[in-house]
Amino acid sequence: MGNLLKVLTREIENYPHFFLDFENAQPTEGEREIWNQISAVLQDSESILADLQAYKGAGPEIRDAIQNPNDIQLQEKAWNAVCPLVVRLKRFYEFSIRLEKALQSLLESLTCPPYTPTQHLEREQALAKEFAEILHFTLRFDELKMRNPAIQNDFSYYRRTISRNRINNMHLDIENEVNNEMANRMSLFYAEATPMLKTLSNATMHFVSENKTLPIENTTDCLSTMTSVCKVMLETPEYRSRFTSEETLMFCMRVMVGVIILYDHVHPVGAFCKTSKIDMKGCIKVLKEQAPDSVEGLLNALRFTTKHLNDESTSKQIRAMLQ
């Protein structure tokens, strides 16, 4: 134990307060089976991010091919540039499916009776850490995807070329790897501004609808509790001093924002209304106290990828804080 400590001296506004050791939490025997399953998925997350970060696209080749439609050599050059990129995009998409299943397994563990979500997070520190790692990955992936228009340009060109060749009764080898059904699913995935967040949101909603005997509050309380965990660690010098690196601080901020966004998509009235169990003002305040260049992307994520920020029920003060 000891990785997740309940804060007995700071019961402020009835929000749960914890310290979660994001750096060292280790699985207990009871957690190990699920932990191993999730770990097998997460071990590929860094290579996915590195591959996405290095993604340059086939813009020049596509442009030359479009401008010179009768030049067969340029058509082939563009096609040969795009095909390996589409295989990479398929890998990213398939990872999202694995992540979806991993999240549902975690939610099952962190919300099941007889324990409350708060008790689960106290007892199952290592699973809580993996949940945080999924959220951290999701925000990083979506940040990179949003900054890279080449992804959709490449895939659109690929689909147009496939359609044109199908009309001419040509079958291309890549169709064995990315068939029409797979291409349709990938197209829907990459059409989203934040595809990984959409995947997590859908996975959470699916989990709620599949577990009708489990109150939705068990799931949303798990999310709001995780937000409080992050917020209290960020605003309390005693806990911040336990982080061994700035990287962990950034991790904690990104997880807090990821959980808020997920909560806002899953909860019927969202994260910003007065009845929300998330202290939105406190969370935004904590972010704004950091170096501006390190949190601008996170503040933008709250501005542009949440669902209920612009609802009438959102207080003017919260909206003003995010302007």
Curated annotation (Swiss-Prot):
Membrane topology: Lipid-anchor
Locations listed in the record: Membrane
Keywords carried by this UniProt record: Lipoprotein, Membrane
Superkingdom, taxonomy of origin: Eukaryota
GO molecular function: small GTPase binding
Keyword Ribonucleoprotein (UniProt): no
Main location: membrane
GO biological process entries: regulation of actin filament polymerization
Any single Gene Ontology cellular-component annotation: membrane
Record bears the keyword Transmembrane: no
Quaternary organization: Interacts with RAC1 (GTP-bound form preferentially).
Family per similarity comment: Belongs to the CYRI family.
Function description: May negatively regulate RAC1 signaling and RAC1-driven cytoskeletal remodeling. May regulate chemotaxis, cell migration and epithelial polarization by controlling the polarity, plasticity, duration and extent of protrusions.
Protein name: CYFIP-related Rac1 interactor A
Species this chain originates from: Homo sapiens
